[in-house]
Amino acid sequence: LPCFALDLSLLVEEALSVQSSGFIEAVDKAMSLLRNEDGRVGNLTIVNRLVKLEPLGEALVIGDLHGDFESLIIILQTSGFVEKMEKTKEATLIFLGDYGDRGDKSAEIYYAILKLKLAFPGQVVLLRGNHEAPKDLLGYPHDLPFQFQNRFGEDWKMAYEKTRALFAYLYNAVFVEDRYLMVHGGVSPEIRSLQDIAQAQENRNEALLEDLLWSDPDENVRGISSSPRGAGKLFGKKVTKEVLGKLNAKILIRGHESSDEGFKIDHDGKVLTLFSRKGSPYFNRYGAYLQLPLSEKFENAQQLIQWIHKF
């Protein structure tokens, strides 16, 4: 059973009022939990920075939040997923990365997702986005330091440095055998096995980490081409199909790109993009999340539309 019953309204209240000491404590606890996660944790099997998930029960998958705390609350309230996690171990909450920057409630988002992880260690997975990347790959604008200054006053630096240290312990990907590969950005033709993804954060693999965190699917590219983002690449349909084939997955689920509808489908239904925040600078009409029965098998992201919730 979880360490404690988590009251959502209390969590929201706490996140909005937490002082730097409470924030730092949550980051420290989460970091020590993540650092020591290895092997079997609930329905998760942890292999370095890869999470293998059993095809049991359901998953709630959330895309980029970028400091939009309101959208996170809407998703958790509407889905009733926290209560579900309390009732059954077979409910897994997966975040696809990009928690901070842009929106002005980055600290609140970090606090809330870390408290969720601490309450349900075997049921919450926090992926790494390009806004949680190593220093030389970090997404722009990186306005987290300014937000922390505003939020925490003179203690902001410690809170910020701890949060930056936490980034290294977030996961590169989630894999559900014969079903899904979930990453923040994209895939690369360099991927030969799950092991490559699991150790992509190690120095010699940084080009692969860059692709996982930064790359985008493109309909007009055959293989790969340079990305207008200045990091990562654009990858074509052929790359998607080859990588999914090598790994034994059917659909790539990722975040990283805004979409007016909150989601989009590419590469003949082999790529689903989720975007879960609203507001500037994207002004998308909808945010979306995915609430998915994991035991069912789908070949194509078109079949997942019935499980996508727009708000």
Stretches found by the model and what they are:
Residues 1-311:
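Feature recognizes metal-dependent phosphohydrolase scaffolds
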